[in-house]
């Protein structure tokens, strides 16, 4: 048995939420519980979508009085999840039909694994698609995590008790997930990624532009300090990675777009 954890923000488009929930309904293995957190007040049109699907899905609505941000909203929802195995999803993404069947089966057959993810296909408003794969083995994920986020957050499955023991989600602007993965791995818990493509993820043409600027650099500083504190990397290598990641946040949009495209093709 497993729960699905989703956070809904007022700026989400009703049609995106509709596709998200429809993809959950079309799974070959149905979720036992879908915890949908309203991160602050949401529009009547969004509520209408949720209400309509509540007749077909095991939805548990968790309304928050005000917008708390992704990390705190997910923590509120995590508390309401009644099953220890929890699958994450975002309201603007689409699960492929066999997602839960494959991921839950993997977690059941690998009880030692605390956190697992999968490959995703990113698509934009023009229908252009990019494949995003990540390292599969525990060792390769640890190596990759020194430089980049080793999981597609919207497509992970984890064990609730281990996430809570690692400190749950903590405030880290744009990087709540990366922060949590590092803390989980620092405790020695095995992690993995499946090679299967199990989700389609919206990645608009303005996504690269949103990943620039001083707020992102502040988050990079916080991430750098966390990696050193957890001994995820040494000082020299960690500083080099920090400088590389920070420089990309200051590059012109077209340069960032080129590097992003090259990274996906690689």
Curated annotation (Swiss-Prot):
GO MF annotations in UniProt: glycosyltransferase activity
Key words of the record: Exopolysaccharide synthesis, Glycosyltransferase, Transferase, Virulence
Listed InterPro entries: Glyco_trans_2-like, Glycosyltransf_2, Nucleotide-diphossugar_trans
Pathway of action: Glycan metabolism; exopolysaccharide biosynthesis
Classification via Pfam families: Glycos_transf_2
EC number of the protein: 2.4.-.-
UniProt KW Cytoplasm keyword: no
GO BP annotation list: polysaccharide biosynthetic process
SUPFAM superfamilies: Nucleotide-diphospho-sugar transferases
Task performed by this protein: Involved in the biosynthesis of amylovoran which functions as a virulence factor.
Record-stated family: Belongs to the glycosyltransferase 2 family.
Protein name: Amylovoran biosynthesis glycosyltransferase AmsE
Natural source organism: Erwinia amylovora
Upper lineage: Bacteria, Pseudomonadati, Pseudomonadota, Gammaproteobacteria, Enterobacterales
